Swiss-Prot record:
Coiled-coil annotated spans: none
Organism of origin: Saccharomyces cerevisiae (strain ATCC 204508 / S288c) (Baker's yeast)
Keywords: Membrane, Mitochondrion, Mitochondrion inner membrane, Transit peptide, Transmembrane, Transmembrane helix
Transit peptide, start-end: 1-8
Protein name as annotated: Cytochrome c oxidase subunit 26, mitochondrial
Subunit structure and binding partners: Component of the cytochrome c oxidase (complex IV, CIV), a multisubunit enzyme composed of 12 subunits. The complex is composed of a catalytic core of 3 subunits COX1, COX2 and COX3, encoded in the mitochondrial DNA, and 9 supernumerary subunits COX4, COX5A (or COX5B), COX6, COX7, COX8, COX9, COX12, COX13 and COX26, which are encoded in the nuclear genome.
Amino acid sequence: MFFSQVLRSSARAAPIKRYTGGRIGESWVITEGRRLIPEIFQWSAVLSVCLGWPGAVYFFSKARKA
């Protein structure tokens, strides 16, 4: 049963592979880019808040004194 499913799947994938240039689906780089870009933005936002809040406090307290 399992082997017949594997054979059917590989028989279907072989003609598709000829037309797609050697791979089924999108490139690994595109997949990882879609996954990592939001995480990089979130990481940079958290890092900016953690490191930048003292500067923001200093800037806004200085602006109100003047």
